[in-house]
Amino acid sequence: MKESDAVILIHLGINIVFAFFFFGISAVVVSCIIKCYNTHDDDHDHDNNNDGHVSITIKERVGIKPYVLRSIPIVDFNTKDFKYVLECVVCLSELADGDKARVLPSCDHWFHVECIDSWLQSNSTCPICRKRVCLKQSRTRPELGGRDKSFNQNHDQTSEHHEFSTDPPTNTDTAIIEDGGCGEANEGQPELTAVVIDIPAKEI
């Protein structure tokens, strides 16, 4: 083999090595560019999907007001007062003679004191009929007392000549209904408190 041929082969080998090296570097660079582009697109889509905050709504059950619960009388249960056996639906046990019980004024359902008190701490309705538990008492306005007195005096003075109706005037003797802890909520609807919590979106 001539010396010139050996030199040509050496140069050819060097060129082949450089060619492989160049193509390898090019492949790595192109791969990195493609990976960075895909990562940018994924981050952009993630930001669009998680823009702002995540809202969580928590509904909290609220029981009846304490003074309403205290207004419900506690009685000693007597089976002789009932034709059928009564069962406390909270504990699923029968009411027995001497048991301390409460009867809900809005629906006349009976329960053990401990059971219904625990129930009404987180609920405002009857466990059986779901009717709202509250007390409603009626009373006459204070100023009606004076009107009634003057009306009776006038009636006594003129009773010899005129005959008056025994029914009181509608516009003066209308009783006021006091709210017994019911508020303006509808009967049968539990009190729910909605709490909205804003949580910043977690960046990935």
Swiss-Prot record:
Keywords: Membrane, Metal-binding, Transferase, Transmembrane, Transmembrane helix, Ubl conjugation pathway, Zinc, Zinc-finger. SUPFAM superfamilies: RING/U-box (SSF57850). It comes from the Eukaryota. Pathway: Protein modification; protein ubiquitination. It catalyses: S-ubiquitinyl-[E2 ubiquitin-conjugating enzyme]-L-cysteine + [acceptor protein]-L-lysine = [E2 ubiquitin-conjugating enzyme]-L-cysteine + N(6)-ubiquitinyl-[acceptor protein]-L-lysine. The lineage of its organism: Eukaryota, Viridiplantae, Streptophyta, Embryophyta, Tracheophyta. This is Putative RING-H2 finger protein ATL61. A zinc finger (RING-type) spans 88-130. The keyword DNA-binding does not apply. It is found in: Membrane. GO terms for biological process: cellular response to water deprivation; protein ubiquitination. Coiled coil: none annotated. GO terms for molecular function: ubiquitin protein ligase activity; zinc ion binding. Belongs to the RING-type zinc finger family. ATL subfamily. One of its GO terms (cellular component) is membrane. The RING-type zinc finger domain mediates binding to an E2 ubiquitin-conjugating enzyme. Its EC number is 2.3.2.27. Residues 142-174 are annotated as: Disordered. It is a single-pass membrane protein. The chain crosses the membrane at residues 14-34.
